[in-house]
């Protein structure tokens, strides 16, 4: 599994109400936080700052610039042919356990 979290990386949220949904990293705040977006109309994940421990990177990446708008991210996802992939929900796994076991 890819461990690099960079701008444009597709990630899966592993904790919270959006657990199992995919999003795209659009900005890196610091070593602990990144800004992600679904965008909401595609995956249901709204733009927000998240702790890097609450996301799991995938091997997919889209070409977006840092701070890209939701519309730019949506166009990049569709151009990369990942729209259906982004809509799929997954059972998140974090360190070998599922998010439902983390309570």
From Swiss-Prot:
UniProt-listed PANTHER family: 60S RIBOSOMAL PROTEIN L14, LARGE RIBOSOMAL SUBUNIT PROTEIN EL14
Gene giving rise to this polypeptide: rpl14e
Gene Ontology CC entries for this record: cytosolic large ribosomal subunit
InterPro entries, A to Z: Rib_uL2_dom2 (IPR014722), Ribosomal_eL14 (IPR039660), Ribosomal_eL14_arc (IPR023651), Ribosomal_eL14_KOW (IPR041985), Translation_prot_SH3-like_sf (IPR008991)
Species, as recorded: Pyrobaculum neutrophilum (strain DSM 2338 / JCM 9278 / NBRC 100436 / V24Sta) (Thermoproteus neutrophilus)
Gene3D superfamilies: 2.30.30.30
Recorded GO MF terms: RNA binding; structural constituent of ribosome
Keyword Ribonucleoprotein applies: yes
Membership in a protein family: Belongs to the eukaryotic ribosomal protein eL14 family.
UniProt keyword terms in alphabetical order: Ribonucleoprotein, Ribosomal protein
Keyword Nucleotide-binding among record annotations: no
One biological process term in Gene Ontology: ribosomal large subunit biogenesis
Full protein name: Large ribosomal subunit protein eL14
């Amino acid at each position: 599994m890819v461990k690099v979290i960079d701008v444009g990386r597709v990630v899966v949220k592993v904790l919270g109400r959006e657990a199992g949904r995919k999003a795209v990293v659009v900005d890196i705040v610091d070593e602990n936080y990144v800004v992600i977006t679904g965008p909401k109309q595609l995956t249901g994940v709204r733009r927000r700052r998240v702790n890097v421990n609450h996301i799991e990177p995938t091997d997919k990446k889209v070409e977006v610039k840092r701070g890209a708008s939701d519309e730019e991210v949506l166009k990049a996802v569709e151009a990369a042919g990942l729209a259906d992939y982004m809509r799929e929900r997954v059972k998140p796994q974090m360190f070998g356990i599922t998010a439902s076991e983390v309570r």
